[in-house]
Regions:
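Interhelical loop/hinge segments that connect adjacent transmembrane helices in multipass membrane
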Residues: 2-29, 134-136, 197-205, 213-269, ...
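Hydrophobic faces of transmembrane alpha-helices in multi-pass small-molecule transporters and flippases
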Residues: 16-40, 142, 146, 169-173, ...
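Small-residue-rich hydrophobic transmembrane alpha-helices
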Residues: 59-111, 155-164, 291-344, 385-393, ...
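Alpha-helical transmembrane segments of multi-pass membrane transporters/permeases
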Residues: 94, 161-187, 198, 319-332, ...
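Short membrane-interface helical motifs at transmembrane helix boundaries
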Residues: 109-139, 339-369
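Alpha-helical transmembrane segments of multi-pass membrane proteins
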Residues: 131-158, 298, 302, 361-388
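Hydrophobic alpha-helical transmembrane segments
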Residues: 141, 173-224, 230, 234, ...
Length: 458
């Protein structure tokens, strides 16, 4: 049955772990720390960006260029989950590595197009309504962000190998080293007078490539073990047409698995752009966008950490029908993460981080504190959603995940449109839309799993 996935997979190898709170926590905490430290890089370089000549508005332009970069990169967003499901043998690993390279090359080329004439003016000045000086910052951030996005794709392969060997601690160590380098640059560059969006991008890119090299180094022995045990020949002669066909079919199988997940990731990545379009049409739009970006910069690391429950769900699927132990674990973990997020509502921390570090004006600080308070429930919603999406991945039903992610964008834009019509303040619009969309996503994935399960039984 689908719920007894931990014993043996379809190729006969043991690839799932038995549930216990201690074992799950030892696997999840490094993932949580990795996600948190990975996402905290952006608030760090926010200090470099906001101290440039454009102040906090420079962060708005920088964030919009990065948003488009991540939206394009998200078309490969299903690759990590694909690797965790399919890259558990030597042949599967090599097929995954080839697929990852093909998608990286195609998407990096695609990333350059909106940053070049004539599309750049249509995107930044037209759709996003950015003034010329901010449009120029967003354009250059997107164009030179090609190097940063490349590091993410390159990291996919060794990171998947570590996750599949339950070595999330080593993946976390690489990310911690990345955050330390980014922190060092965030301190050093402003002291050298190197501030503004361009230097913020330099700090991010340097840390990302450093993380890739460390992750690759940690994964080397596990890759060697995979290669020595592979069952499907890869480096065979050109005359071996059967082997070539089998290699092609493996890549094609993984591509078919990753496309629905990646399309869904693209839909999710498009959501910040949708928020920017709606909030940009509210009263005092520049202030509202700035508040949105500085507060989502705090909420995203914790929300992303909660979403890592997807990987935990793949490693620890249900052992029997009605097994809800991981669901309860996800709820508890999300509640703890939400409590940590609420620390940014306290006056002392809020005044320092938003007022001093991110240069938010004193009269706008209560907006930032209010937004963070409204995000308090979001980590729990994210963790529950991630648990259900992980089950869909284990059952090799990426269409269920995609259904949820389509629902996310529909719910997000619908909520934004309604709140804009009602005259809701810009920063409240974004938080309400994100929370509502997350709930709708969870319901949609769960419903899709139920429907697809019934079809399989027929």
């Amino acid at each position: 049955m689908w719920y007894n996935m931990r014993a043996m997979n379809d190729k006969g190898e043991k690839d799932r772990a038995d549930f216990s709170v201690g074992r799950v926590t030892r696997f999840y905490v490094p993932l949580l720390m990795q996600a948190f430290s990975q996402s905290i890089s952006y608030p760090l370089v926010g200090g470099i960006t906001t101290h440039g000549p454009l102040d906090v508005n420079g962060l708005t332009a920088f964030a919009q260029g990065q948003t488009i970069m991540f939206m394009i990169g998200s078309l490969g967003g299903g690759l990590v989950m694909t690797g965790m499901v399919h890259a558990r043998t030597g042949g599967g690993y090599l097929a995954f590595r080839r697929l990852n390279f093909i998608m990286m090359a195609a998407l990096l080329l695609l990333q350059c197009l909106p940053a070049l004439p004539p599309l750049d003016s249509l995107v930044f000045s037209g759709a996003l309504h950015l003034p010329p000086e901010l449009a120029a910052v967003a354009r250059s951030t997107l164009l030179w962000g090609v190097f940063m996005n490349a590091s993410f794709f390159l990291r996919n392969v060794p990171m998947v190998v570590l996750f599949n060997n339950l070595q999330s601690g080593k993946a976390n160590a690489a990310t911690v080293l990345r955050i330390l380098l980014t922190l060092a640059l965030a301190i050093a560059l402003p002291r050298l007078g190197l501030v503004g969006p361009a230097w913020g991008l330099v700090a991010l890119t340097a840390g990302c490539f450093f993380e890739f090299f460390v992750t690759w180094w940690f994964a080397r022995p596990y890759v060697h073990a995979l290669m020595t045990s592979r069952q499907i020949p890869w480096h065979s002669s050109l005359d071996d047409l059967m082997a070539a066909k089998r290699r092609y079919l493996m890549v094609l199988e993984q591509l078919r698995f990753t496309l629905p997940l990646s399309f869904g990731s693209f839909i999710l990545a498009a959501s910040p752009l949708a928020i920017a379009v709606f909030v940009g049409r509210t009263a005092d739009a520049q202030t509202m966008l700035a508040i949105h970006y500085v507060t989502i910069g705090v909420a995203n690391p914790i929300g992303f950490a909660a979403l890592r429950m997807q990987a935990v769900s793949i490693a620890f699927p249900p052992a029997f029908k009605g097994d809800r132990r991981m669901l309860y674990y996800a709820i508890g973990a999300g509640a703890v993460l939400g409590a940590a997020l609420l620390a940014f509502c306290t006056p002392s921390l809020a005044n320092w981080y938003f007022g001093v570090y991110q240069t938010v004006k004193p009269e706008h600080l209560h907006y930032a504190r209010g937004a963070v308070a409204m995000y308090g429930l979001w980590p729990m919603l994210q963790a529950v959603r991630a648990r259900i999406e992980g089950i869909a991945a284990v059952r090799k039903l990426p269409a269920a995940v995609m259904a949820g992610q389509i629902t996310y964008l529909v719910a997000l834009t619908t909520t934004l449109a309604i709140t804009l019509y009602l005259g809701v303040t810009g920063w409240k619009m974004s938080v309400c839309a994100i929370n509502t969309a997350t709930v709708c996503t969870t319901v949609a994935v769960y419903a899709a799993l139920k429907v697809m399960s019934r079809r399989k039984k027929r």
